[in-house]
Amino acid sequence: MRVVFKLPDELRQELKNPLGELIEGNIPEPYVKAKNIIEGDDGVLITVGDVVTENIMRVGLNPNLAIYDHKTERREYKPRIIINGVLLTVKNPPGTITLPLLKSIKKAYSLILNGKSVHIVVNGEEDLATIPAVLYAPLGATVIYGQPKRGIVLIKVTNECKRRCAKIMRRMEVVRDGD
């Protein structure tokens, strides 16, 4: 049976608010600021989004986990991303979090614990992947995702932000085959 977590309309507006620290500015400014914040940090670095992953790599940081979909703002995008690790691909329709996406993110963290870097290329849309990326991340990890027209959002993973993401997941509509 296929299970999908679907974003209900009432959560859509809420998720337009940053889940962490908003770093505003034009490229490359937010990425340079993010680098200064996290440089020297031994924690796991996760990027969500093509533009975010590309620009984090451009300022000299290599994410342990990069999740992207070859799109930006719903348009095709060919990021200049060097895949320097394990490549996983997964299907995930827009506005959803599928079980295969959840399993890929969990698998990625186990690979990271074994010293690997992981890229998850999503066929569909990765916009909601930040939620499970935070949920499954080790405490102290940094998750960075894009905030359209504003900049990037930097999340330091704590128990509190894990609880917030779990609460969001619980509020999503669970759809099973045949529903």
Curated annotation (Swiss-Prot):
Residues that bind GTP: 50-52, 69, 71, 126
Metabolic or biological pathway, per its Swiss-Prot or TrEMBL entry: Cofactor biosynthesis; coenzyme A biosynthesis
Keyword terms of this UniProt record: Coenzyme A biosynthesis, GTP-binding, Kinase, Nucleotide-binding, Transferase
Annotated GO MF terms: GTP binding; kinase activity
EC number: 2.7.1.237
Catalysis: reaction(s): 3'-dephospho-CoA + GTP = GDP + CoA + H(+)
GO biological process, one term: coenzyme A biosynthetic process
Function (record text): Catalyzes the GTP-dependent phosphorylation of the 3'-hydroxyl group of dephosphocoenzyme A to form coenzyme A (CoA).
Family assignment from sequence similarity: Belongs to the GTP-dependent DPCK family.
NCBIfam families: deph_CoA_kin_Thcocales, PRK01160.1-1
Protein name as it appears in the record: GTP-dependent dephospho-CoA kinase
